[in-house]
Each structure stands twice: as structure tokens, then as C-alpha cells.
Design a protein with these regions (language model features):
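NAD(P)-cofactor binding segment of oxidoreductase domains
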Residues: 131-148, 218-225, 268-269, 289-316
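Strand-loop microenvironment adjacent to phosphate/nucleotide-handling motifs in alpha/beta enzyme folds
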Residues: 54, 179, 184-188, 345-363, ...
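N-terminal Rossmann NAD(P)H-binding glycine-rich loop of SDR-like oxidoreductase domains
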Residues: 194-210
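A solvent-exposed beta-alpha-beta segment
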Residues: 44-143, 227-231, 248-251, 255
Length: 549
């Protein structure tokens, strides 16, 4: 088997699991979606064989229906056989197609067969089942594998029914993502005007996709980057063309959270009912190099939005927060900690029918700049994969599940409350690196090396999700915890913002303070003990530039 990064041989399966013959509306929805995918495959095909040899794993209603489609539309290839666990049909034929089995014997079956491509389509199987079949295939040299969306994605309208995709490592990370009913959780948004900041980012764009099917009257996609806002706007319009949220009005808005007057104007003009505040500068090492920008954008951008929401009677305000706000050791982390305090302070001034809250969670897999795409790119270039420390670990959640829980929280959350998503158990980064290498059909340290490079500025080995005094308590909603708020005086917060403002914004009479990074760090360290201790310790170790303190 070649360990290069361009495959010359691929394999094509359709794997269906958990379906029986009957009048299932879910099956009908799935079959329509699969037919649409086949049609799009036909349209988007650039190169490849027209007589692909296909094996369908699963000989039930869904498998038979898609086999019939392939048979009628010969351009897609030819179904050579079904592979199934049903002893009653193994050894028989269905519409002239032999049924082989069981699925556990897939290796011996395929070793004596000729085939071309692999597409896993397990509409209702858990992650563990996908992992089992995937590993069986890859361990026997079948490495170019694709996957079709699951039935829950199709029903909820979150699946991109355009074409098959390369299998995503999220499918085999060993934990089944949390699923909730969007129809139930988005009831509070029906007929409402929803404003999403950072709508072009990883979290903001996924929130926008899920919101589209929630019955909102209008979606305002607010962001600073025109390319990312244009991208999500076009994507949502395509989804509307497929019948998802077709009645909603989608409005792209280019703007800057730091522009106080414009933020107030746009909130007033849109008359939005709900705000999901996702916008933030988030890359820790980058923000350690641009500390003033982190505070200017994250802190004052959030304050501008909160003030506008209070002034113009926005019903619900939900801040997306991060585990890096817990006993922060970076300027980014401190900026998000201050944002949490700003939300709780706004809640004290909220009108009776207003609710301000934040939702905190750890890392999401697959976001722009996160370790997953970084590792994948490092593998594509031949390695090595770079890991900070063998002991480093993080909590992970998929973007769709995090966003669905955020949307649920927006509906059930109470004014002035703090919420935390249950992230499960932490994952060691080095183990994740090994997993991604194996997933790519390669061997860690043999084909792709793993290099330990040491901590970067603002990083720590373990990121806690809460402080001891926050005492997380379960709610009646799955994977949603409530925190006890840590007391913080409003006057202290106001004083800190007053001192930080002339550093971030040019102020007459205080010109000498503008962009004074050393003063900004000193003010933050004076206010945040964990940041001060971390900076002092790293300074002793010679890891921190002298101009930071």
C-alpha cells in the first residue's frame, strides 16, 4: 500500500444500517436525499470511470431503493453485491444482485472482489458503528472512503445534501455527538428577528445554518470580514433554494463591533429580538502578539453590543464564551472573562422582559485554525505533526452539537445566569494526533513523525472548564450545566474599562496612553491574579518578552 498523499485506487460502498421495509417517512426522506446526491454526483463529475463497481452494505429498504436508482442511471456505476447480516437473505439475490454476508466478513468478501470506490452511508448508526466498519476497511488497505449524511441530519435540515464528502475524523473519534430536537428547542425564535455577530466564523455560521430551519422571520448576519459573510450568506440562500427556511429573510451586514455608534444604530434599525454574540478575536498566540487589539475588539465590542441591546429592548442576549476565561493565563482569556462579567452586569440593569446570559464551552473540532485542520494539513505535507506537550489535553465537542446546545440555552436560559456545556472527558492532544495519522491510513512515527515543540505564549497544559466556587450543577436539559456566579463589583468593572479605554482608542489629552501595551498588561494583571502569576512565572523561565510587563 502506498503511503503517498494521492490515492490511485479507491473503493465505493453504500452502507445502510437500521432500516427495515415499511412505510417509514424517515426512510422516504433519506431516499430522496440520496437520489439528490446521486444527481449532484452526475452534475459535478469531472473525471472517473462510468462503470464503478459498487458494494452496498445493507440490503434493506434503503439499500434496495438506492440500488434501483444506480441500476437505472448507469452513469453512476454498477452494484456488484449487497452485504448484509440477515441470515434469511444471505445467499439469495435481490433484483439480480447477490446478497453476501455477514458484514463482519466484509474483509474476506472484498479480498476476492473487484471494486472502485468507498462511500459509507449509515443514516442512523452511532459513531461506534461507523468506527468499527471504517477500521475494518482501513486495516485491510481500503483507504479512500467517503460518507453520506445521517438520517437525523436530513430530518433536521442540517445536512448538506449536495454530494458525498470525504469521511471526517469526527465520525470516528469515539463519541456519539449530542443530538437534540431543533424543532422543540427553536420554538422561542419563530417569527423573531435574530442577530448573529461573527456569523462568518465557525460557530456563527453553524448557528446560522441551524437557525434557518427554526422559523425565524429574519436572520441578520453581522461580521467584519466580507468574504466570510458573503460565503455563509450564499450558502444559506442555496439551502433556501432546497426548501430549508425558505420564508426567512436573510440580511448580510458588514460592520465593526468596535464602532459604538454604528452598533447602536444597527441594533436600533434591525429591531432584533435575539442576539447571539459569537464575534471575537480568539487565537491565543496571535492575541499575545496583539494584546491591545484583543481587548479593543473583544471587551469593548461586547460592551457596545450589550449597551445597544439594553437601550433598544432586545429580548434575549447570549454570549459565546470559552474555557480560556477560567482563571485565564492569556490576554485573550482575560478579555473573555471580562466579557462574561459584562454580560452579568448588563443582566442587573435589564428590563423585566429581557434576559442576558453566557454559555461557556471548550474546544470545538474542525473550526478554522483549530488543531484538527492543522494536523490534517501537516499530514498532507508529509509531517511532522507538532504537539505542544505530551501531557497537554483539551475538552472537545463538535461544532453542530455545541451550536444546538447554545440555541437550546438561548430559549431556556434565565436572566443573569451562567451556563456550561458538558464536554465529556478531556482528550490528550498527542493521542488525537496519533488517531488522525492512523485515520489517514498511515502509521505514527513511521510514516508521519510527531514532534514536541513546547508551550506557546498564553498556553497551559490543561484548560479547566470552571472555577471551584462556580460549582456546576446539572439542569433538566442534557449536557447543560448551570454555574454559580462569582461576585464582581460593577464599580470595579467600570473603573477597569475606564482605564483601558484610552489605551485602545485614541483620546485627546491622553495621547501618550494610546496603544501602550505594557500599561494594558499591567492593568489586566492587577485585576486578574491568575494572569499575573502566569506572566511572572514565565518571565522567570525566560519564555516571555520583557516588554510584556
Amino acid at each position: 500500500m502506498s503511503h503517498g498523499f494521492e490515492t490511485t485506487t479507491s473503493f465505493h460502498f453504500y452502507i445502510f444500517h437500521g432500516f427495515s421495509v415499511g412505510k417509514s417517512n424517515q426512510c422516504a426522506i433519506l431516499i430522496v436525499s440520496l437520489r439528490n446526491q446521486l444527481a449532484c454526483d452526475k452534475i459535478t463529475k469531472r473525471v472517473g470511470k462510468m462503470d464503478k463497481r459498487i458494494y452496498i452494505i445493507g440490503a434493506g429498504f434503503a439499500g434496495q431503493t438506492i440500488a434501483d436508482d444506480i441500476k437505472r442511471k448507469k452513469i453512476f456505476g454498477k452494484v456488484n453485491a449487497f452485504i448484509d447480516d440477515n441470515k434469511d437473505i444471505i445467499g439469495t439475490t435481490i433484483d439480480g444482485i447477490p446478497v453476501l454476508g455477514p458484514i463482519s466478513s466484509v474483509t474476506s468478501i472484498l479480498s476476492n472482489s473487484e471494486l472502485d470506490e468507498a462511500i459509507i452511508a449509515i443514516p442512523s448508526a452511532p459513531t461506534e458503528r461507523i468506527r468499527e466498519i471504517y477500521e475494518t476497511l482501513t486495516q485491510n488497505g481500503f483507504n479512500h472512503i467517503k460518507i453520506l449524511p445521517g438520517i437525523s441530519q436530513v430530518i433536521e435540515g442540517t445536512a448538506h445534501l449536495v454530494q458525498t464528502r470525504e469521511i471526517d475524523p469526527l465520525d470516528i473519534l469515539g463519541r456519539t455527538p449530542v443530538t437534540i430536537s431543533l424543532k422543540e428547542s427553536l420554538g422561542y425564535l419563530r417569527g423573531k428577528r435574530v442577530f448573529i455577530t461573527g456569523a462568518g466564523g465557525s460557530i456563527g455560521s453553524e448557528l446560522s445554518r441551524q437557525l434557518l430551519s427554526g422559523g425565524a422571520e429574519r436572520l441578520y448576519l453581522f461580521g467584519h470580514g466580507e468574504n466570510s459573510i458573503c460565503g455563509i450568506y450564499r450558502e444559506l440562500r442555496l439551502l433556501q433554494a432546497e426548501g430549508v427556511g425558505e420564508k426567512a429573510t436573510i440580511v448580510p451586514i458588514i460592520g465593526d463591533m468596535r464602532d459604538r455608534e454604528y452598533v447602536d444604530y444597527i441594533v436600533r434599525q434591525t429591531k432584533c429580538n435575539v442576539i447571539f454574540h459569537c464575534a471575537a478575536y480568539k487565537h491565543v498566540p496571535m492575541m499575545e502578539e496583539n494584546q491591545v487589539a484583543a481587548v479593543e475588539n473583544n471587551v469593548f465590542g461586547t460592551k457596545n453590543l450589550l449597551d445597544a441591546a439594553l437601550a433598544h429592548k432586545v429580548d434575549r442576549f447570549v454570549l459565546i464564551s470559552t474555557d480560556k476565561a477560567v482563571a485565564p493565563v492569556s490576554v485573550y482569556g482575560v478579555s473573555k472573562m471580562i466579557c462574561e462579567k459584562l454580560v452579568l452586569d448588563a443582566a442587573k440593569r435589564a428590563a423585566e422582559n429581557q434576559s442576558f446570559m453566557f454559555v461557556r464551552f471548550g474546544n470545538v473540532l474542525g473550526s478554522r485554525g483549530s488543531i484538527l485542520p492543522v494536523f490534517q494539513n501537516q499530514i498532507k505535507t508529509g509531517g511532522p505533526i507538532t504537539v505542544t506537550d505530551e501531557k497537554m489535553e483539551r475538552f472537545f465537542m463538535t461544532i453542530p452539537e455545541a451550536c444546538s446546545l447554545v440555541l437550546q440555552t438561548g430559549g431556556v436560559g434565565e436572566n443573569g445566569k451562567s451556563y456550561l456545556l458538558d464536554m465529556g472527558e478531556p482528550i490528550k492532544i498527542i493521542e488525537l494526533a496519533k488517531q488522525i495519522i492512523k485515520f489517514s491510513g498511515l502509521e505514527p512515527y513511521k510514516d508521519i513523525d510527531i514532534k514536541i515543540v513546547g508551550s506557546r505564549k498564553g498556553e497551559r497544559l490543561i484548560e479547566p472548564l470552571w472555577l471551584k466556587e462556580e460549582n456546576p450543577q446539572p439542569t433538566k436539559y442534557k449536557k447543560l450545566l448551570m454555574l454559580d456566579n462569582k461576585e464582581y463589583e460593577s464599580s470595579r468593572l467600570e473603573k477597569l474599562l475606564t482605564e483601558l479605554h484610552p489605551i485602545c482608542f485614541y483620546t485627546k489629552g491622553k495621547e501618550n496612553l494610546f496603544r501602550d501595551k505594557a500599561l494594558l498588561v499591567k492593568l489586566l494583571c492587577d485585576d486578574c491574579e491568575s494572569l499575573r502569576d502566569f506572566y511572572e512565572e514565565t518571565k522567570k523561565d525566560g519564555q516571555l518578552r520583557t516588554d510584556l510587563l
